[in-house]
């Protein structure tokens, strides 16, 4: 699944705006900047991901189109299969399906749905994967997926069961790479050792099966003052990790474009990470890094 940047792929997790024109402009810009994947999140209060991705497919020619990630408990698996394969058809096979177990209790309440336990949410995710595979393989199911077996599947998670499920079924395994600050007020990077432990857990479960490793990078700062930026991030994240520890974590891509490119190569060697997703507000400042990897 190599992209324009050779051994790596880079995606942007987009916020879908209120107007069609603004969304079209954003999508074209992401592709022009050299990103490989354009992602739409799935949260109440935001535009629905499937129509957004169909429109993105109409106004771009190269980027893959990804749901990052669906709140799977909101979906009936049979109805979801229809939306997935229909979107796959309308985007000429550029869809990547990202699924998660769901975690925002307030969204379930807003939808008038009970908030299931973690076990129940992962149970539903597993049932959904099984049902999607069954329907993809059914020659009577319409619309049919563009490729046999359906679009590439991304499963994201942090816990043992979610990552075991990902190791068994996913083409792309998404690592969250975050922890909570002591007061719970802000996301903070998990330590390099914590991420490495999760990666090794997945590798053991894969048993030699190939899968692409994805990481959502919350912390991007393209700057010539790396030491200062790391010190500032340590303060912002309430000292969960020191500046020296932050210098090693793959979720904090900080430094000049050339320095960040070197970090990405080092993280690939240590963690096997080859597919990174940045948040939309970092899309412009991260783009020069792509130039160093072409």
Q: Can you describe what each PLM-predicted range is?
A:
Residues 1-294:
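Active-site-adjacent structural elements that line small-molecule/cofactor binding pockets in enzymes
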């Amino acid at each position: 699944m190599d992209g324009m940047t050779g051994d790596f792929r880079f995606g942007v997790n987009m916020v879908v705006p209120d107007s069609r024109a603004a969304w079209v402009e954003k999508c074209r810009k992401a592709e022009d900047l050299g990103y490989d994947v354009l992602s739409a999140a799935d949260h109440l209060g935001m535009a629905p991901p499937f129509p957004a991705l169909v429109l993105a497919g109409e106004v771009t020619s190269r980027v893959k189109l990804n749901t990052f990630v669906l709140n799977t408990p909101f979906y009936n698996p049979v109805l979801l299969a229809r939306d997935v394969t229909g979107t796959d058809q309308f985007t000429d096979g550029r869809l990547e399906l990202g699924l998660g177990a769901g975690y925002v209790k307030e969204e379930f309440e807003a939808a008038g749905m009970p908030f299931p336990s973690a076990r129940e949410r992962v149970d539903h995710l597993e049932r959904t994967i099984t049902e999607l595979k069954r329907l993809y393989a059914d020659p009577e199911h319409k619309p049919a997926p563009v490729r046999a077996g359906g679009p590439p599947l991304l499963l994201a998670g942090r816990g043992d069961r979610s990552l075991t499920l990902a190791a068994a079924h996913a083409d792309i395994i998404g690592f969250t790479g975050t922890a909570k600050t002591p007061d719970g007020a802000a996301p903070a990077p998990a330590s390099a050792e914590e991420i490495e432990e999760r990666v090794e857990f997945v590798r053991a479960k894969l048993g030699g099966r190939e899968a692409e490793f994805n990481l959502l990078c919350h912390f991007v700062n393209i700057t010539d003052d790396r030491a200062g930026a790391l010190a500032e991030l340590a303060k912002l994240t309430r000292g969960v990790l020191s500046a020296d520890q932050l210098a090693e974590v793959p979720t904090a891509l900080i430094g000049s474009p050339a320095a960040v490119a070197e970090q990405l190569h080092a993280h690939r060697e240590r963690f096997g990470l080859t597919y990174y997703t940045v948040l939309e507000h970092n899309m412009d400042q991260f783009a020069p890094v792509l130039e160093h990897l072409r």
